[in-house]
Amino acid sequence: MNVKVFRVSGYFEKNGRKFKFTKEYRALKEEHVKELVYSDIGSKHKVKRRKIFIKEIKEIRPEEAEDIVVRRLSLEL
């Protein structure tokens, strides 16, 4: 199995305001990335899943990753 790097962008609503986000994750499938986004944003910002809106999930090359931890973990292999 090959671990891929994904960039996720979207927004979430909290107290009537919208907050944009862009995150990068390593995962096997897009479905795993969705769960990671819901879990991560939901726990950090105390937001329900129905208030998190994912606009785009895009597979990127490890060299394109802006998150230094994701990039280093991907390029070590």
From Swiss-Prot:
InterPro entries, per the entry: Ribosomal_eL20, Ribosomal_eL20_dom
MF terms (GO), sorted A to Z: large ribosomal subunit rRNA binding; structural constituent of ribosome
Superkingdom of origin organism: Archaea
SUPFAM superfamilies listed in its UniProt record: RplX-like
Gene3D superfamilies: 3.10.20.10
GO biological process, one term: translation
Cross-referenced Pfam families: Ribosomal_L18A (PF01775)
Signal sequence annotation: none
Cellular component GO terms, alphabetical: ribonucleoprotein complex; ribosome
Record keywords, A-Z: Ribonucleoprotein, Ribosomal protein, RNA-binding, rRNA-binding
Subunit structure: Part of the 50S ribosomal subunit. Binds 23S rRNA.
Similarity-based family: Belongs to the eukaryotic ribosomal protein eL20 family.
Protein name: Large ribosomal subunit protein eL20
Species per Swiss-Prot/TrEMBL record: Pyrococcus abyssi (strain GE5 / Orsay)
